[in-house]
Amino acid sequence: MKRPVAVLAGIGRGVPEQVMTNEDFASIGIETSHEWIMERTGIAERRIAREPEQSTAWMAAEASRKAMERAGVNAGEIDSIILSTASPDRLLPSTAVDLQAELGASRAAAFDLSAACSGWLYGLTVGEGLIAAGSAETILVVGSEKMSSIVDWSDRSTCVLFGDGAGAAVMRRSRDGRGILSSYMRSDGTLAELLYRPHGGARVPFCENVLSERSHYVKMAGREVFKHAVRSMADAVDRALDGAKLTASDIDLLIPHQANIRIIEATAKHANVGMDKVFVNVDRYGNTSSASIPIALDEAIEQGRVGKGSTVLLVAFGAGFTWASMVVRL
């Protein structure tokens, strides 16, 4: 097992107060039911950012301030800000620089990272590398998503799945043996069109046809995504445990990406971890993309499921396809 380079010094989450239940879909003309959604996804409700000021950067700032407070860090100490999002507030410049301005982190380098639901773990891995290289000592890594702005609210297959929220971590150099014990990242671009936003980018910019065809919204081939998600999450679990030279019995808590309860259960089964050692909050938040793992980790700490010295396994998959995992000693 390697000696950790970087430790997660503070975690925080920021979620909008507005709750949308499964029953609420009837009010917007979606033919579905609580039972139908729960049976297929395990989702009962999700948070929706409906107020004008509740942007991706706003939620990121809410989570970041809590993480910074818990880490005992002020904005002037932050060297780098890495913000993972699939729902940036605008295409140019990055949402990270808006977050930087909101926090007053004037000496930080700030940039966005795009790896969909795996993005927060990608960000932690990049941050660990910056600390190892001596390029930074204190890094803010955020996953923030306003998924409600990029889903088609007339498409039952996608709009019931997603929610809004943000999670953040302050990373610092490890000095006591706690921190990241292993990390793993993979991608397979041949699967990109299983889960994607077809148009609205540089290849096919926004125009009347894009808007009328609603092709700027998330499209998903659900069955194929499920199959590849289970396979990639299993690979990620194995690689993280092997990298840390640990077994499932050494893990205090498994925190998988909160996409779908069936994927979570399949991941736990492959990892040989009982569901009593798996953190689940997909029922209350839905799929918040790259924010899901930091939100879950923050709640797990808050609920006393894990604490200082606990060993957690984090594992994610997302559009791209991307997948990633990490073993962390808190």
Residue ranges and their predicted role:
Residues A132-A166:
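Flexible, glycine-rich active-site loops centered on histidine and acidic residues
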